[in-house]
From Swiss-Prot:
Function noted in UniProt: Binds to the 23S rRNA.
Annotated disulfide bonds: none
Gene giving rise to this polypeptide: rplI
Family: Belongs to the bacterial ribosomal protein bL9 family.
GO molecular function: rRNA binding; structural constituent of ribosome
Domain of life: Bacteria
A Pfam family hit: Ribosomal_L9_C
Name of the protein in question: Large ribosomal subunit protein bL9
NCBIfam families, per the entry: L9
Record InterPro entries: Ribosomal_bL9, Ribosomal_bL9/RNase_H1_N, Ribosomal_bL9_bac/chp, Ribosomal_bL9_C, Ribosomal_bL9_C_sf, Ribosomal_bL9_N, Ribosomal_bL9_N_sf
GO CC annotations, alphabetized: ribonucleoprotein complex; ribosome
Protein species of origin: Rickettsia akari (strain Hartford)
Length: 171
């Protein structure tokens, strides 16, 4: 299926790019999410005329996301959960829970699909989680999972000493 991107898509292309993608990917993801349109002759002409509008709209969205990223930067989210003695959680911390807590902290609605987890969080500790609000912009938050507030504070102190040791080594 040939499509034309009307929004930037990470690892695929930018606005106005004409691509050949798998039928299922186009039909089930790109078209319903309004990330692309079919590459028909009328649509090709339309994109040539409206490419500047799409780029201006994307630039405006990007500026908004940069403001939100400034709020998100250096956020530390603490989750208090029940866990076994060896630190394994009875359950897990999901990307939806991270999105909900982050949304409250920055007063902006962040979808769980914007939270990128390398692996599921199933034990206590300190994790770095990627937040991707725009195809070209991402930020990182620190997620601390602990059994109690005091344990969370201990993890924070550990993280600070690791960071200061890393800075001392690089200097």
């Amino acid at each position: 299926m040939e499509i034309i991107l009307i929004k930037p898509v990470r690892k695929l292309g930018k606005i106005g790019d004409m691509l050949k993608v798998a039928d299922g990917f186009g039909r089930n993801y790109l078209l319903p999410q309004k990330l692309a349109i079919r590459a028909t002759e009328p649509n090709k002409e339309l994109i040539v005329k409206q490419k500047h509008e799409f780029e201006a709209k994307d630039k405006q969205i990007r500026e908004e996301v940069e403001k939100i990223n400034a709020l998100i930067k250096d956020q530390k989210l603490v989750f208090i959960r029940q866990a076994s003695d060896d630190g394994k959680l009875f359950g897990s911390v999901t990307n939806k829970e991270i999105a909900d807590k982050l949304s409250k902290n920055v007063s902006y609605n962040i979808s769980h699909s914007n939270i990128i987890l390398d692996k599921q969080i199933k034990s206590t500790g300190v994790y770095t989680v990627e937040i991707r609000l725009h195809a070209e912009l991402n930020d990182i938050v620190t997620v601390i999972v602990a059994r109690s507030e005091s344990e969370a504070q201990d993890y924070l102190r550990e993280k600070k000493t690791e960071t200061s040791e890393d800075l001392a080594e690089s200097a």
